[in-house]
């Protein structure tokens, strides 16, 4: 599936943010046979805090193995407390392994979310003024 260049006019699930939470949500949807979703990320890449905080010495404050997902365990961490670049790299591996770029629109900020009760759906206003 090619990457999305514009959000579709309607999607079953919109995931706001491509940090760990958004990534895991997207993977779990796929594992349950749901592919009608989009990930909206205001940043330029996946990774959330691990994308944004790669200053010298940045590292996790819990043991690295806790950054492994139960369905995608990582056992080859280089240190007991992994540094930011290694965590970011493991996130990128998940993105590649689950083809998440095909479902993501980067550099896309969600400005507002409004529930449309009469239609039983959410309407998202994006920074480029489009509506999803």
Tell me the role of every PLM-derived stretch.
Residues 79-132:
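Feature captures the FAD/FMN-dependent oxidoreductase FAD-binding
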Residues 11-39:
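N-terminal Rossmann-like FAD-binding beta1-loop-alpha1 element of flavoenzymes
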Residues 21, 44-45:
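Conserved Rossmann-like nucleotide-cofactor binding loop
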Residues 7-9, 33, 100, 120:
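Residue-level preference for short coil/turn positions at secondary-structure junctions
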Residues 1-11:
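A short, basic/flexible loop-to-alpha-helix module at the beginning of a structural domain
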Residues 42, 49-93:
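Glycine-rich active-site loop/strand segments that organize a redox cofactor
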Residues 45-46, 113:
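Active-site loop signature of alpha/beta-hydrolase-fold enzymes
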């Amino acid at each position: 599936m090619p990457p999305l260049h514009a959000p579709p006019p309607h999607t079953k699930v919109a995931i706001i943010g491509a940090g760990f939470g958004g990534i895991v949500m997207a993977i779990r949807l796929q594992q349950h046979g749901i592919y009608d979703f989009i990930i909206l990320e205001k940043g330029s890449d996946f990774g959330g805090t691990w994308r944004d905080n790669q200053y010298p010495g940045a590292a996790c404050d819990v043991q690295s193995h806790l950054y492994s997902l139960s369905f995608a365990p990582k056992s080859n961490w280089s240190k007991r407390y992994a540094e930011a670049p290694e965590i970011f790299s493991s996130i990128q591996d998940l993105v590649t392994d689950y083809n998440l770029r095909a479902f993501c629109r980067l550099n896309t900020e969600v400005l507002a979310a409004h529930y449309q009760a009469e239609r039983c759906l959410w309407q998202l206003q994006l920074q480029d003024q489009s509506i999803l």
